[in-house]
Amino acid sequence: MKIFSTLLSQKPKGKLVIRPSTTIHSSDPFSKFIVTKNTEPLSLGDLRKSDSGNSAVCLNAENTILSTLTDLQKEEERNWDPVKFVAGKLRGVISPIQAYVTIGKKFSPNSLVYTSRFFQLHYFPEDHFMSCFRKSKPAITVKSNKKFYLNGKVFNKDKEYFNETRISKANEVELSKIQTAMTRLTNRHRNSIPSEFAYLRRDLKLKVKTTFIKEWCKLNGDKAIREYVNLNRSPNINPASMKGKPKKSFLDNLGRSTVGTAKDGYYLYIVSIFPDKDMLGEFNDEVNRSVQKVANLDWDGFLTPKKGTKGKNWVESFNDSINVQTINKILEINKFPFELRREQTEG
């Protein structure tokens, strides 16, 4: 029994880190492709209109022919939305890594942190394999699945909706009737699933990202990252000890965001029901609650695996399952000037 217990209690193989590629050489810094430990977070706190990215305005200032702003450009300036601007800067992870995980269905059940009738949210902390390749702080991907025709809003002969709740709870006979009704409808009208329309997918992403970044910044996620970055840049301060922190700190003694503070990392939303004008308010509330749920996670409790090898948290177990050689081959094929390494931890 003692030997068996020892076998189960194993230490992680090492921390996953990104290092310069030994095969692909480039003068471009990592920050052009992925975030680094010193990458600043996205924030709503210090935005100015000059940050709006209206390149036409900047070009006109230097162009004698187009020295005055057109009425259209003035209108764009007046209608500039700083929240949508920052939301537009939210990125996910580099596509080869996203494909590697999605196609291989390499999701840990521990990453699923929030479920609603609209979507599921998977959250991956910053030291998770996927977060190593995120393109913004925080990172977010909004995906949709082809679950319901017309968002489940299909009338039966009694003018009752075959909505998503009814579908999920239907017995075999009723489900057969629902499927028949939907098949007849979709045979007449192609592309009856919202996720098949590119403009609806774009609109969905903007809705999620706009609501997400407002709540994430409201919960001080940007301040926590900035605090850690500043401490990490200071040669005389060890981020692991965090002694002498400011009175209002958003980090604990291990340099992690405190409970109630929005977290850095990678957020993956998988949406089943697209919000229309009748349900947009409820949808936004659910997005807010999902961000709050992650912010309120206790790190030790969240990282403890539901089952698995003793001595490792679920992120370490997932990282240990990654074939580094395979990942580096994928990165090389896609011409990324960096590769994945395992950095041995002390102790």
Curated annotation (Swiss-Prot):
Q: List residues traversing the bilayer.
A: none
Q: What does the UniProt entry say about where the protein is found?
A: Mitochondrion matrix
Q: What are the UniProt keywords, alphabetically?
A: Mitochondrion
GO terms of biological process kind: mitochondrial tRNA 5'-end processing
Source organism of this protein record: Saccharomyces cerevisiae (strain ATCC 204508 / S288c) (Baker's yeast)
Stated name of the protein: Protein PET130
What additional remark is attached to this entry?
Answer: Present with 721 molecules/cell in log phase SD medium.
GN (gene name) = PET130
Where is it found, in Gene Ontology cellular component terms?
Answer: matrix side of mitochondrial inner membrane; mitochondrial matrix; mitochondrion
Phenotype when the gene is knocked out: Mutants are deficient in mitochondrial protein synthesis.
- The keyword Mitochondrion is annotated on this UniProt entry: yes
